[in-house]
Design a protein with these regions (language model features):
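Alpha/beta catalytic cores of group-transfer enzymes, especially the acyltransferase/condensing modules
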Residues: 102-172
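Glycine-rich nucleophile elbow surrounding the catalytic serine of serine-hydrolase chemistry
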Residues: 90-100, 104-105
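Helix-rich "cap/lid" substructures immediately adjacent to catalytic or cofactor-binding pockets
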Residues: 2-89
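Conserved SAM-binding loop
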Residues: 89-90, 172
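A short acidic, glycine/proline-enriched capping/turn motif at secondary-structure boundaries
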Residues: 75, 95-96, 138
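Short, well-ordered loop/turn elements at secondary-structure boundaries
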Residues: 1-2, 166
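Short, flexible micro-motifs
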Residues: 12-15, 97, 106, 171
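Conserved active-site region of classical short-chain dehydrogenase/reductase
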Residues: 69-73, 99, 111
Length: 172
């Protein structure tokens, strides 16, 4: 079995070409649909089975981020049947997909996290993430960098928050 690194996609990876790509019988799809049903959201399968791609509908954060997560996890599960996955990574939304893929959180936990973040994104519109180093060139914790992060968070008046720690970086 060959070894593989899986890089998880971020926003922008669900496009018109993605329509019809979700298998309604796949466990991930069923879990996602249950979670969205609990929140009163349009089913992902309804979006994925649409006759045409409508950017205003499909690219809403509350729809597109969960679609990307589910599709990426299905693809990664298929890849892991053919390859030994030795590392995972991603950017932006891909960080959260990588957490699921690596087993740091369950699929359901990761899905709920991504769904909640996408709803917050719609509710608050503005925002973003900053990746800030916490380690030195030898990948050892750097107290000065950590102090700078804390000082920045404290001076933000509650506008900036720590999201996750990812490797040697803080995601703010």
């Amino acid at each position: 079995m060959s070894r593989a690194v899986v890089l998880c996609p971020g926003r922008g990876s669900y496009t018109e070409a993605s329509l019809g790509s979700l298998d309604p019988d796949h466990e991930f799809v069923q879990i996602a649909e249950q979670c969205r049903g609990d929140l009163g959201l349009e089913p992902l399968l309804s979006l994925d089975r649409a006759d045409r791609f409508e950017p205003a509908r499909h690219l809403r954060p509350a729809h597109v981020s969960p679609l990307i997560l589910v599709k990426a996890m299905i693809d990664a599960a298929a890849a892991s049947e053919e390859h030994e996955v030795v590392a995972v990574g991603g950017n932006s939304l891909g960080w959260y997909i990588a957490l699921c893929l690596a087993g740091s959180v369950s699929f359901e936990e990761g899905f709920r996290l991504v769904q909640r973040m996408s709803l917050l994104q719609e509710e608050h519109a503005d925002g973003g993430q900053v990746l800030y180093p916490r380690v030195d060139g030898d990948w050892k914790p750097d107290p000065e960098l950590e102090a700078a992060i804390e000082a920045s968070l404290e001076s933000s008046g509650g506008e900036a928050m720590r999201s996750i720690e990812l490797g040697g970086f803080a995601v703010l």
